Amino acid sequence: MKKTNDNYHSARFVMSAPNIHHLPPDQGMEVAFAGRSNAGKSSALNTLTQQKNLAKISKTPGRTQLINLFEVAEGIRLVDLPGYGYAAVPLAIKIKWQKALNEYLNKRDCLRGLVILMDIRHPLKNLDQQMIVWAINKRIPVYLLLTKVDKLSRSASKIQLDMVKEAILPFMGDIEVDVFSSLKKIGIDKLQNKLNAWFSGSVNE
């Protein structure tokens, strides 16, 4: 397989789907991006692909209501999952999102890894930890990105990073954590390397 780090900038939007029943066939490889509303998922995807408008960014938390697919190369996709944890979303919609999220995570066999984005100032909220536990139980590798690191000083960022590293030890799974900033392009190379490693496996036919 061609190195995908040469292809991220060529990523293209494929579709938005309300649930897995509207997604393409469960083939190839996908890496999903998850996180609380306003954790910076869309910004991270745009930075990764060097396309500022690939994933729509909104200042309104909870705007990502659908499963959004982006194709990097044939059979290789990035998935932007609905943001979770925004209290102002009506309960009926919240339940609908939760069902779509659960179905994708539990039934999508081509999922190769899960990137969970968390604001470095507010990491490891209950829903974040639930996502980690789910992934570990399913033996899905997890990459935690502490976003918006540019909002903190270097020393404060290190304190937060060390705290999260310590906190995830009890999870005992394939889980790593790094800092990230879409604004300052911090952590982009490490993210690319992680995705390349996940995508280097054999394609699920």
Curated annotation (Swiss-Prot):
Mg(2+) binds at residues 42, 64. GTP binds at residues 35-42, 62-66, 80-83, 147-150, 180-182. The keyword GTP-binding applies. GO terms for molecular function: GTP binding; metal ion binding. Its cofactor is Mg(2+). Pfam families: MMR_HSR1. Disulfide bonds: none annotated. Keywords: Cell cycle, Cell division, GTP-binding, Magnesium, Metal-binding, Nucleotide-binding, Septation. One of its GO terms (cellular component) is cytosol. InterPro entries: G_ENGB_dom, GTP-bd, GTP-bd_ribosome_bio_YsxC, P-loop_NTPase. GO terms for biological process: division septum assembly. Belongs to the TRAFAC class TrmE-Era-EngA-EngB-Septin-like GTPase superfamily. EngB GTPase family. Necessary for normal cell division and for the maintenance of normal septation. This is Probable GTP-binding protein EngB. It comes from Hamiltonella defensa subsp. Acyrthosiphon pisum (strain 5AT). The lineage of its organism: Bacteria, Pseudomonadati, Pseudomonadota, Gammaproteobacteria, Enterobacterales. The gene is engB.
